[in-house]
Amino acid sequence: MIRLRRVLFLLTSVLVLTACQPPGLVVDAPQPKAEAETLRVGTLYGAQIYMSSGQGLSGFDYELAQKFADYLGKPLEMQPYSNRSELYDALAKGEIDLIAAGITESPNRRNRFRMGPPLYRVDQVVVYRQGNRAPESIEQLSGNLTVVADSAFVETLTRLQQTHTNLSWEQTSEKDNDELIAMIASGELNYTLAQSTSLDINRRYMPELRSGLVLEEKVPVVWLLPAQNSDALMSKLLAFWHQEKRAGTLAHLNEKYFGHVKRFDYVDTRAFIRAIDAKLPRYRPLFEEYAGDLDWRKLAAASYQESHWNPNARSPTGVRGMMMLTNATASQLGVTNRLDPRQSIRGGADYLRDLINRLPESIPENQRMWFALAAYNIGLGHLEDARRLAEAQGLNPSAWRDVKQVLPLLQKRKFYSQTRYGYARGGEAVHYVDSIRRYYDTLVWVDNQKPKDEPQLPDEIQVEETAASSGAEPPTAAPRE
């Protein structure tokens, strides 16, 4: 009887305590996290993924993430990470909502994350340098192959190792894939693996790169979401994907970033000389008129590097015209129609002069143009980062020959992690300036061979100007940049 009373007492106590809880309170139940006010996207640096330059932010994943944020009605907060491990940790800890970093689907990733719908497809290819032996079999890669740790390439090689037992490779977590590709071009490595799109983009300014064996074909590139508690976001992502696919946005972005790169043809000196005869006579009067205190031939060389003297030129980042101005820069310079050669050349000349004037006084007069052109390409902030790196290495930050040595370091994590403005394609800026200098030297040589007659503005240019300068830039059929 006593034991029964104790049991009844305990039950009564529990009921009383339960009744004292606030209505609706569930003890120890996990509370859902409040929805973030921004769309937090983790990414990696890369030309086709996410990058900052003198022309602003760009990249397939960046543009699509911005559109997804707009679809959700939230600001985009895009955070680049140094490597995949940090990126995956951030997603696991809830520091970001999703990963958009040009990452391919793979068995291991399917076990760890939820996969978004396919954005585009790539091949996994062997990369080697022109002049080196092209690998003809998997076995020839052994001992000569270096890949990025935690990459899908490691999974591919591990599977191949089951049937090619002698296959071996090195892994690195200190360098990203673009760095390994650059090491192939410089002859520091024999072989690496790359996505076909990445190889095509890098080959535009490292033409010695060659594509070898294809190890995987048409692998989907996807966004990654957390394995748990991501149903709502996945549902919205799928709806967004279907909407943009129907609207043609995905096809447009694929063409914008990848459709043109395979057709890239490295411009040699003979092609440039042909352009001097065929195109330059129409635009030379404009270069001479707006160059002012600049050498018009440097302005013309920069324009050729930017647009091949095509007034309707357009880059994957949305810059347009003879001098490839951004919308923001054009607005600041009073350029209402970037397709008007006169306005574009005037705007480009004014912008170059402004960059020259903003450079430190310690830079010699005869080198200021090369520094300004580098800033035109990647931005003044990244240029200042390179100058600081040069000084830290005991080099002269006001000498172009020294700064061009360290600009490619802005692509290496070890160095860009120490800078204020972070990653930049410094090697591309060096190639950009070097190309302009070669074009300039050729222009000087050609100009010295010809009579110094003052050419008149051709009638067809005047007609174009009358039509173009009377109104704003005409709209295009492409989706909004």
From Swiss-Prot:
Task of the protein: Murein-degrading enzyme that degrades murein glycan strands and insoluble, high-molecular weight murein sacculi, with the concomitant formation of a 1,6-anhydromuramoyl product. Lytic transglycosylases (LTs) play an integral role in the metabolism of the peptidoglycan (PG) sacculus. Their lytic action creates space within the PG sacculus to allow for its expansion as well as for the insertion of various structures such as secretion systems and flagella.
Ranges for region Disordered: 450-481
Recorded hits in CDD domains, A to Z, give:
MLTF-like, PBP2_YfhD_N
* One GO MF term: peptidoglycan lytic transglycosylase activity
Entries under InterPro entries matching the protein? Lysozyme-like_dom_sf (IPR023346), MltF (IPR023703), Solute-binding_3/MltF_N (IPR001638), Transglycosylase_SLT_dom_1 (IPR008258)
Which HAMAP family does this UniProt record tie to the protein?
MltF
Which reactions appear under catalytic activity for this entry?
Exolytic cleavage of the (1->4)-beta-glycosidic linkage between N-acetylmuramic acid (MurNAc) and N-acetylglucosamine (GlcNAc) residues in peptidoglycan, from either the reducing or the non-reducing ends of the peptidoglycan chains, with concomitant formation of a 1,6-anhydrobond in the MurNAc residue
Q: Which GO terms describe its biological process?
A: cell wall macromolecule catabolic process; cell wall organization; peptidoglycan catabolic process
What UniProt notes about the protein's domains is:
The N-terminal domain does not have lytic activity and probably modulates enzymatic activity. The C-terminal domain is the catalytic active domain.
Q: What is this protein called?
A: Membrane-bound lytic murein transglycosylase F
User: What top-level class of enzyme does the UniProt entry assign?
Assistant: lyase
Q: Quick one: signal sequence residues? A: 1-19
Q: Which organism is it from?
A: Shewanella amazonensis (strain ATCC BAA-1098 / SB2B)
Region annotation (Non-LT domain) ranges: 20-261
